[in-house]
């Protein structure tokens, strides 16, 4: 296309069939959700032939890329488009229950900036709004003791300018940490969802944890990222709690 435009001094219309810049682009939330589901279905080996909603042919057959030319993120985008981008381009496996909240968060940034967001901008929003948030509560150190399936924890956190030592117990590591935070720092919430997976980063593997808490009927998500799965899950819980503090202050 660039060669054609250079040699002819003619511009290829953005909606020109097969080759236009926007021919395969999906901005609409409902279109993105349908395409994301179709691509996921195809990735699982369920389709012998190309059969993805709103895409008559495979864009890669004509030199297009899914991330750059199909899923485009702006204020109209849906939960499926944002999650598909983070999963396909950056290796995150966004829980189904988190996708709507995340989609609205990213759309809000696009709306405020009045522009389409690039992949690295979406990642930056995800990291800044959800991952390893440490204000006002930051994890310093912890240790667990286990008796069968019952855990007790000694936890040190930074709560604003104060270093606080917490103690708690529960039916799992995360449950014991949650109880320590609620009992010692006075938070009131229900621990509602937890998911984890590994993400390859070069030759290393990171543990990614997703935690949701419910406060007054509203679910709030946080994400933790660490080489250690226990640290990752604790950071995810603290991210959710810190996000609840941020929302309460708005």
Residue ranges and their predicted role:
Residues 170-174, 181, 209-219, 234-236:
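Terminal-proximal interaction/regulatory segments of ATP-powered molecular machines
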Residues 153-157, 199-222:
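Positively charged, aromatic-enriched nucleic acid-contacting surfaces
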Residues 152, 160-185, 189-198:
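Small-residue-enriched alpha-helical segments and adjacent helix-cap loops
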Residues 1-167, 203-206:
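A mid-to-C-terminal "edge-of-domain" accessory segment
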């Amino acid at each position: 296309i660039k060669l054609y435009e250079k040699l002819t001094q003619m511009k290829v219309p953005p909606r020109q069939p097969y080759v236009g810049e926007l021919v395969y682009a999906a901005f609409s939330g409902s279109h993105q959700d349908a395409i994301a589901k179709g691509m996921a279905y195809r990735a699982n080996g369920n389709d012998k032939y190309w059969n993805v909603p709103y895409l008559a042919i495979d864009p890669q057959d004509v030199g297009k890329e899914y991330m750059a030319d199909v899923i485009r993120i702006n204020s109209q985008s849906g939960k499926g488009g944002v999650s598909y981008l983070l999963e396909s381009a950056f290796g995150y496996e966004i829980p189904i229950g988190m996708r709507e909240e995340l989609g609205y968060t990213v759309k809000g940034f696009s709306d405020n900036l009045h522009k389409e967001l690039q992949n690295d901008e979406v990642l930056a929003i995800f990291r800044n709004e959800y991952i390893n948030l440490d204000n006002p509560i930051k994890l310093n150190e912890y240790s667990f003791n286990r008796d069968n399936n019952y855990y007790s924890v000694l936890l040190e956190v930074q709560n604003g300018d104060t270093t606080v030592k917490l103690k708690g117990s529960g039916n799992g590591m995360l449950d014991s940490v949650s109880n320590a935070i609620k009992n010692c720092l006075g938070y009131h919430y229900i621990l509602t969802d937890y998911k984890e997976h590994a993400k390859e980063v070069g030759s290393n593997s990171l543990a990614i944890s997703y935690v949701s808490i419910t406060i007054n009927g509203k679910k709030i998500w946080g994400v933790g990222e660490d080489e250690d799965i226990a640290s990752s899950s604790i950071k995810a819980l603290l991210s959710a709690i810190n996000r609840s503090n941020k929302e309460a202050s708005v």
